[in-house]
Amino acid sequence: FEMVNSTDLAKTLNYQSGLRVENNCQNCGFPQVRINGLEGPYSQILINSRPIISALSGVYGLEQIPVNMIERVEVVRGGGSALFGANAVGGTINIITKDPINNSFQVSSMFSNMDGKSWEQYMGANVSLVAKDNSYGIALYESYRNRNPYDRDGDGFSELGKLNMNTFGFRAYYRPTHFSRINLEYHTTNEFRRGGNKFDLQPHETDITEQTKHIINSGGLSYDLFWHEYKHKISLYGSIQHTDRNSYYGAQKDLNAYGKTNDLTWVAGG
């Protein structure tokens, strides 16, 4: 992630072979990833191997996952990835979040500019604490991103919308014995994005506006038990994600274009 200087998952996937990230709307600016040429709905995005990203949160999901929460990204291309989900025909993208390994602290910051017209700011922080006997540990992360709207041709309508996002989360573990482990993770995202024109006015006072505000809470709990010199394993897990979205998709000063959506996704197994 440091080599490609990316701030979110969407920018990172551009450098993966067999993948292509496209920006499909100049107003709301939602990205989608193509695997083997197939459109976004044919791909499955997992977090720590759990399919908790719903169709609602997946619309803008590629930009809502900051790089400082990611340890690595596993990509499976082709029809065989359909074993991970019904819509994983093109492939699967599995996001593995950072695990606490040692005591560490890191702060990063980045400023960028597009054609001298639009500034983008990113700040991130990571903290990891691990017990001396490795019986417990916790990794915390926080990121902030702010992007001004970008109007390339000067017609008053954005090519890239305004974006403001805060993300916080942690991943922790506890080992009751040498052969068992309890994992707990949680992250929350508060994001505002808007595209169109006349950004100083309310959405219903403009010619066209697409605006969303997301509050996403996601978490998971798992228990692993090993025996026979770690050759055998039993695992129980549960993950959940709740998405609260307030939106405006309208034109010509339409007062009826406001909307509110709530979505709950959960998965459990062993």
Question: Where on the chain are the PLM-derived regions?
Answer:
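Transmembrane beta-barrel domains of outer membrane proteins
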Residues: 36, 76, 96, 126-130, ...
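Flexible loop and strand-edge segments within Gram-negative outer membrane beta-barrel domains
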Residues: 147-167, 173-175, 179-234, 240-264
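Membrane-spanning beta-strand positions in outer-membrane beta-barrel proteins
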Residues: 44, 104-106, 135-139, 179-185, ...
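Transmembrane beta-barrel strands of outer-membrane/channel proteins
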Residues: 107-113, 140-146, 184-188, 236-242, ...
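Outer-membrane beta-barrel translocator/receptor signature
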Residues: 54-56, 69-71, 82-94, 98-153, ...
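Short acidic/polar hinge/loop motifs at secondary-structure boundaries
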Residues: 34, 50-77, 98
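Extracytoplasmic beta-strand/coil segments of soluble accessory domains associated
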Residues: 10-51, 71
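Solvent-exposed coil/turn segments that connect beta secondary-structure elements
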Residues: 1, 18, 26, 38-40, ...
